[in-house]
Swiss-Prot record:
It holds the Pfam family SAM_MT. GO terms for molecular function: rRNA (guanine-N2-)-methyltransferase activity. Its EC number is 2.1.1.242. This is Ribosomal RNA small subunit methyltransferase J. It comes from Shewanella pealeana (strain ATCC 700345 / ANG-SQ1). S-adenosyl-L-methionine binds at residues 98-99, 114-115, 150-151, 172. InterPro entries: 16SrRNA_methylTrfase_J, SAM-dependent_MTases_sf. It catalyses: guanosine(1516) in 16S rRNA + S-adenosyl-L-methionine = N(2)-methylguanosine(1516) in 16S rRNA + S-adenosyl-L-homocysteine + H(+). GO terms for cellular component: cytoplasm. Keywords: Cytoplasm, Methyltransferase, rRNA processing, S-adenosyl-L-methionine, Transferase.
Length: 253
């Protein structure tokens, strides 16, 4: 069970906490509130930091959907998205769902798997609002879904529950930042203090390789070691990150 402080003025907060197994604690580090019909996580000892929510409808993700480069983006190349090929993807470390949304907006069917209950609650709330949106709601309902569980233990269960045959498993485990690196974005500071680094991330590769029929893609900082010490088949490098691609079979239409 995860302790959380929440504003009891909102009955939907109580139902959300009951659904996700969250326990009221007046001394908790984090607070869940509804602001303008959006479930938001606040770090209580840093009130100047912006709260965290999942928004697939507006803001940065909407801008990227419209102007982010389409299929020319590195993430699209990494998962094998091309003319006539629209892979089904399991995002095994969903986080705030941004990479999953990019892939869904490009036409992929994406199942998000998230093990942290608070993050899963934020994702579900983001999906709720996206499903109701007049512009993107139709294809969001068809392409994006959520499973709450650990990808180390439950990856195959997630795919089975959604009746999904998986072409690609996508992983972006939280990696410790270098001490000398620039200050982490304020929003990510809140997120990282909640979930911490994925110290068991090496355990993700084997179940991902077992589930994916075509490839596994691992997003890593440019300075990070290969996941579980396994060299990828190919690497797609960006300015600060890289996509390690473990190929099992060709991507065909």
């Amino acid at each position: 069970m995860t302790s959380i402080f929440f504003n009891r003025h909102y009955p939907t907060i109580e139902s959300a906490c009951e659904r996700w197994g969250l326990v009221y604690d007046p001394d908790a580090e984090f607070e869940l509130v509804f602001e303008d019909n959006i479930l938001t996580l606040i770090k209580r000892d840093e009130p100047k930091l912006k709260g965290i929510s999942v928004d697939f409808v507006s803001g940065a993700v909407a801008h990227r959907r419209k102007f982010g480069g389409g299929r020319g983006q590195s993430i699209a190349k990494a998962v094998g998205l091309k003319q006539g090929v629209m892979p089904t993807v399991v995002d095994g470390t969903a986080g705030l769902g941004r990479d999953a949304f990019v892939l869904a907006s490009l036409g992929c069917k994406v199942l998000m798997v998230e093990r942290h209950p608070i993050v899963a609650a934020l994702l579900e709330d983001g999906l709720r609002r996206a499903y109701e949106d007049a512009e993107i709601g139709g294809w969001m309902q068809q392409r994006m879904s959520l499973f709450h569980g650990s990808s180390i233990d439950s990856l195959a269960d997630a795919a089975k529950a959604s009746n999904t045959e998986v072409d690609v498993v996508y992983l972006d485990p939280m990696y410790p930042h270098r001490e000398k690196s620039a200050l982490v974005k304020k929003e990510m500071r809140v997120f990282q203090s909640l979930v911490g680094a994925d110290l068991d991330a090496d355990g993700l590769l084997a179940p991902a390789m077992a589930l994916a029929t075509k490839r596994v893609v691992v997003k890593r900082p440019d300075y990070a070691d290969d996941l579980d010490g396994v060299k990828p088949s190919m690497v797609i490098a960006t300015k600060k990150n890289r996509f390690d691609v473990y190929v099992k079979a060709a991507m065909t239409a």
